[in-house]
UniProtKB/Swiss-Prot annotation:
Keyword Transport in annotation: yes
Function, in words: Produces ATP from ADP in the presence of a proton gradient across the membrane. The gamma chain is believed to be important in regulating ATPase activity and the flow of protons through the CF(0) complex.
Gene Ontology cellular component annotations, sorted alphabetically: plasma membrane-derived thylakoid membrane; proton-transporting ATP synthase complex
Source species taxonomy: Bacteria, Bacillati, Cyanobacteriota, Cyanophyceae, Nostocales
Name recorded for this polypeptide: ATP synthase gamma chain
Domain of life, source organism: Bacteria
Amino acid sequence: MPNLKSIRDRIQSVKNTKKITEAMRLVAAARVRRAQEQVIATRPFADRLAQVLYGLQTRLRFEDVDLPLLKKREVKSVGLLVISGDRGLCGGYNTNVIRRAENRAKELKAEGLDYTFVIVGRKAEQYFRRREQPIDASYTGLEQIPTADEANKIADELLSLFLSEKVDRIELVYTRFVSLVSSRPVIQTLLPLDTQGLEAADDEIFRLTTRGGQFQVERQTVTSQARPLPRDMIFEQDPVQILDSLLPLYLSNQLLRALQESAASELAARMTAMSNASENAGELIKSLSLSYNKARQAAITQELLEVVGGAEALT
């Protein structure tokens, strides 16, 4: 017969765990909202930067512009910037992006190219260090909601690698935020920069809302407002120098957006994982309660049988 006290203790333990997972789900939801607000807040700056870059690019389209950050050279070595999380309890978020980066490294090796990692997040750092992979720099303990200062710091390292010609191309491996239950590890080239297509680039802004007591994400496509600068605009500096100065800022802005997307993906994965854990805890509590009631009923029945048996023995 199951021990009633052990079942009761287990029910209480599962209830306490459910409180923790539910609290973690709500905290993750609050942070997703903060990430959403940050994306919206940085959008005007990103729009204006794209407009100026497109304007300068249009103004200089007939000139022979030789800028280091735009120059494509023969690729012999590739830097892989991998963005993961510092913590677990977020489903397959870390595993998926690490696997994508590892597969890309194998592809580069098969092509006869050297590679090195720049890591963001403790999980990816631990994984690749255990496998003795080349790591040029790592960044851990970043804010839950990425900041521009953090993006600038990482961008400086990437610029140093590229301009010193230690690597000829830098690729970014991060998790693109799709929805609360879906995210996708993707790869894009960061350096050399490609400013083509700025005038037609669309972007998406996500909003976390509630409907019927459930969290959901609404996505809004925003069309870029980039357009040529006025023909009569006079520059105090050489337009080439201005473009050269703005390109690192453009890189930092791209990197900040990738950090924001990755953070939102991690938080959404944690929300989903904790929601599933809470549901499983609820089901386990029901099952344990049923077992407890059956065991209690069996114990009462046994006691009654013993009482009846004792009474019959006395008569």
